[in-house]
Amino acid sequence: MTRLERFRAMLTLRHFDEACLEGVPTGEIHGELHTGIGQEAIGAGMMESLQPGDAVVSTHRNHYHALAAGVPMKPMLAEIFEKASGLCRGRGGHMHLFDAEHNFSCSGIVGASLPVALGYAYSFSMKGQNNLAVGVTGDGGANNGAFHECLNIAGAWKLPLVVLVENNELAISVPIGDVSATATIAERACAYGAWGKKVDGTDVDIVAEAFAEAAHHARSGRGPAILEASCHRFRGHFEGDHDSYRTMKEKREMRERHDPITIARRKLLAEGLAGEAELDAMAEASQREMAELLAEVRAEPLPEAAGALDYLFVGGKR
Amino acid sequence: MSSAVRNLSISQTVAEAIGLEMERDENVMVMGEDVGKIGGVFGATRTLQKRFGDKRVRDTPISEMAFTGMGVGLAMAGLRPIVEIMFVDFIGVCLEQVYNAMAKIPYMSGGNVRVPMVIKTAGGCIGSAAQHSQCLWGLFAHLPGMKVVAPSSPFDHKGLLSAAIRSDDPVVYIEHKALLLKKAETFLNGGHVPEERYAIPLGKAKVVREGSDLTLATLSASVEYALEVSEDLAREGIDLEIVDLRTVVPLDSETVAASVSKTGRLLVVDEDYLSFGLSGELVTRVIEALGPGGLKQVARHAVPDVPIPAALSLEEAVVPGPASIAQAVRELAAVS
Ligand SMILES: Cc1ncc(C[n+]2csc(CCOP(=O)(O)OP(=O)(O)O)c2C)c(N)n1
């Protein structure tokens, strides 16, 4: 991807999650919603290193990873808006997006993503496929036992697993510094014979390069990689979270200093890769496209209640 | 006892019970994600860390297997830990410590070892689909060795939690996510919460509405749902007797059987899954008590053995709520 394409990808991610926000006050999304707003550089940065057949297994904060994995935007937005035309026919919802075609899945249970990613990694290794599995976790999820179990297995059996840690420094209200024995998550790599690196996850170019390195390591049969990308969660943990564990000043400064889109824009302008007008036009176009998509999705019907018991088992209701 | 209704949320009654028990017994402590600094995602431990310090009210990492097992060790070492599992749906990651350690050690030790521990967790539907909207009290009840509590009213939340903390047996205490922020004065039942410390014995159901036509046995949020529709149903000519079970283990089937011997009809409403759970168990016990001819009609209204779907249209089709409860009552009453 070119630098400009990375920038455009971040805009798409941001505008996608902003579209989701619109469904909360209206009740169109009637459960929890966790957005990735502020963390766009990671989703956009991983995109270019994923190849057809790769698997991505994400978390409760999964939208950006799904889009990076190639999950089509319209059925995904429709699923989040609980529509019959959604990716999972309205059964899954925002925390449970599944796309068999793109080997994308996720879990609302913290820590539950890595074991599934490990399964994909084993299958790729068994079949001699040159694919990799990305297991996503937050910093909080890295303290779940599954993190250790999966990395140990992947290390012992040299499986093509990339553990992508989105370190936004908070698990809801609990700071990672209070609950991790190591200063970084990446440094735990040595315990598993894994590649490990912590990078600035607010700079899409840095993420793209680092993810490419991690992916190369995993694809070359040398075992797992831990890529830890630092970032900032701009909104509350979920929509409705009072976010009282951070001061207004902290939150304002975070948005001013650490917005990956602003950071990329500044770099593109400084390096003469684009002009103000071009970038503004790009943002407007992206916003307009998303508004059109949202309008289309909103017009779709909800699933019919009569089908509530369908899809439990293959070929039948019960 | 003071008599004015204090307009507390359920979370506040829960925090009040824990605070009073922590004052009473220095061995009582709380551990879990976000329970300290912010006082719980629903505020059910608010102010406790300030009052009792961060050793006794501990924010943990997302390491449920470790801190649930820690609860077992702490209890064996003489403390009375309250371990918060934020949502009951997350119990899968630490079920090992719950059912193989906490619940079995008292029996396996021939009664030599006590595990006076409480797992405090939030269950019930909150619109967040398959992995965040379950009840699961039937799961715990199926596994021997734990008392299982699922309160409905503000009064019961406080008194049953105090009893759970004082219990020398392990207890799973399941709040309902949709009730935690609801205010006392909006409850039809048990809105008055005395300021002082009190405990309600575990295993005693409560008749929250007397009636003559049909016994509706339920617990947790469904008690309010049933009360909400009971007056409409009365106007239609169906006089409900509503029994709040309060605890699944012990299950007070005597109170239910006594009610059924009067009304002749039993409807069990359960927000948990239908099969192999509370509703089947309760019906069986009532039949065992009254004999197969002891009731005229029986029915169950519960989640029909599917995961909770995301879309509201589907969720309403599978999760019992006021409208579906009223419908189930009408259908049962119509059979003669
Ligand atoms: C096993 C389990 N425990 C607790 C939760 C509740 N919970 C959901 S997200 C979250 C915090 C996750 O923090 P982190 O992994 O850092 O990801 P972030 O939300 O910051 O993206 C918690 C505690 C859960 N979903 N699953």
List the model feature ranges, each with a label.
Chain B
Residues 1-174, 178-179, 184, 316-317, ...:
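Thiamine diphosphate
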